[in-house]
């Protein structure tokens, strides 16, 4: 899937996720040569250097949560997993974003995996001492284990398949749900038509900025 593509990985990304990238034909490179930037922690020093770079400030670089790789590895329809849903914003913006849309999609799936792991561990304990009546069933179960495994993985990725129809995951709106605009389009010019545009740097509280702007405009 990533044949010939180059990816940079933050130190917060596990070796398992990096291996998925390589198994799909991707190559590991430095930041400047990379086509994709992956991280699992917006506060990690490696990722902070990206956020503070000129490329990121000028919108020439985007950081993605590396759980995207796990998502495509656990689904048969790899192209159905939207990369845009895994954009990893700076830590200073995440609290504000969660307040507006809820948990990020990778947080939802991580929680699902933990619950799935707990259920499987509990089931294993119950099956340590099978009753005589279940011995034949266990034999058949072992025989069909490989057949059932893909079904489990497919269910694990259900939130991704139903997304963005199921907007309870992150609150993003599907493009299909947007109304079509039939009027004339005009270029947006900051400072005109009653709208202003601001560039926010470093870890500034978004709510404080909004309040300051309201006082300035009132």
UniProtKB/Swiss-Prot annotation:
Expression sites by tissue: Specifically expressed in germline tissues.
Organism ancestry: Eukaryota, Metazoa, Chordata, Craniata, Vertebrata
Subunit architecture: Component of the MAJIN-TERB1-TERB2 complex, composed of MAJIN, TERB1 and TERB2.
InterPro entries, sorted: TERB2
GO cellular component, one term: nuclear inner membrane
Subcellular localization, as worded in the UniProt entry: Chromosome, Telomere; Nucleus inner membrane
Family per similarity comment: Belongs to the TERB2 family.
Domain of life: Eukaryota
Disordered as annotated region, ranges: 117-143
Loss of function: phenotype: Mice develop normally, exhibit no overt phenotype, but are infertile (both males and females). Gonads are characterized by the absence of post-meiotic cells.
UniProt key word Nucleus: yes
Biological role stated in the UniProt entry: Meiosis-specific telomere-associated protein involved in meiotic telomere attachment to the nucleus inner membrane, a crucial step for homologous pairing and synapsis. Component of the MAJIN-TERB1-TERB2 complex, which promotes telomere cap exchange by mediating attachment of telomeric DNA to the inner nuclear membrane and replacement of the protective cap of telomeric chromosomes: in early meiosis, the MAJIN-TERB1-TERB2 complex associates with telomeric DNA and the shelterin/telosome complex.
UniProt GO BP: double-strand break repair involved in meiotic recombination; homologous chromosome pairing at meiosis; meiotic attachment of telomere to nuclear envelope; meiotic telomere clustering; oogenesis; spermatogenesis; synaptonemal complex assembly
Principal location class: nucleus
Entry keyword set: Chromosome, Meiosis, Membrane, Nucleus, Telomere
Organism annotation: Mus musculus
Signal peptide residue numbers: none
Protein known as: Telomere repeats-binding bouquet formation protein 2
